[in-house]
């Protein structure tokens, strides 16, 4: 598989630097976070980095599937919601972390669950950008970001094949 014309391949080193840059931006706003909500699966890696840098210990996941194959976004499916304890007060004092906001559909779904939370993503595209409070890099809507966990020397199919949601 060859990369599309507007491809943005991200190495592990680059992603780590960008996630730390996100943590710096969040630290600069002086907010004390009572919890972090990580959007799986893409938000797991930046959440680990940001939670370390900001010393956030209470970490929750929200599991939403929208890409049911590699490159086609489908209907949103909430596989695991947010605990009532984290969701209280509309998510006040909660930091939501994801790798990317693309079309904004996933971000809108999580924003509806936690309307008072702060949404941070490492990368943002124009359609999703209005839903993000803090991000590091904006890329054009027609650029495909290749994250390091998706790549070998070429695109790598997951070991477990088939769609599980």
Curated annotation (Swiss-Prot):
One of its GO terms (cellular component) is plasma membrane. It comes from the Bacteria. It catalyses: GMP + diphosphate = guanine + 5-phospho-alpha-D-ribose 1-diphosphate; XMP + diphosphate = xanthine + 5-phospho-alpha-D-ribose 1-diphosphate; IMP + diphosphate = hypoxanthine + 5-phospho-alpha-D-ribose 1-diphosphate. Its main location: membrane. GO terms for biological process: GMP salvage; purine ribonucleoside salvage; XMP salvage. One of its GO terms (molecular function) is xanthine phosphoribosyltransferase activity. Belongs to the purine/pyrimidine phosphoribosyltransferase family. XGPT subfamily. Homotetramer. Purine salvage pathway enzyme that catalyzes the transfer of the ribosyl-5-phosphate group from 5-phospho-alpha-D-ribose 1-diphosphate (PRPP) to the N9 position of the 6-oxopurines guanine and xanthine to form the corresponding ribonucleotides GMP (guanosine 5'-monophosphate) and XMP (xanthosine 5'-monophosphate), with the release of PPi. To a lesser extent, also acts on hypoxanthine. This is Xanthine-guanine phosphoribosyltransferase. It comes from Rhizobium meliloti (strain 1021).
């Amino acid at each position: 598989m060859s990369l599309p014309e507007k491809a943005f391949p991200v190495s592990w080193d680059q992603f780590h630097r960008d996630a730390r840059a996100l943590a710096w931006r969040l630290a600069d706003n002086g907010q004390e976070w009572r919890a972090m909500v990580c959007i799986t699966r893409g938000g797991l890696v930046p959440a680990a980095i940001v939670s370390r840098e900001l010393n956030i210990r209470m970490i929750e996941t929200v599991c939403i599937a929208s890409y049911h194959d590699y490159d086609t976004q489908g209907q949103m499916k909430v596989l695991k919601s947010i605990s009532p304890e984290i969701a209280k007060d509309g998510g006040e004092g909660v930091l939501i972390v994801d790798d990317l906001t693309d079309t904004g559909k996933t971000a809108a779904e999580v924003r509806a669950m936690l309307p008072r939370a702060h949404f941070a993503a490492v990368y943002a595209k124009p359609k999703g950008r209005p839903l993000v409070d803090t991000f590091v890099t904006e890329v054009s809507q027609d650029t495909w970001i290749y994250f390091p966990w998706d790549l070998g020397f070429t695109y790598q199919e997951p070991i477990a094949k088939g769609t599980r949601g």
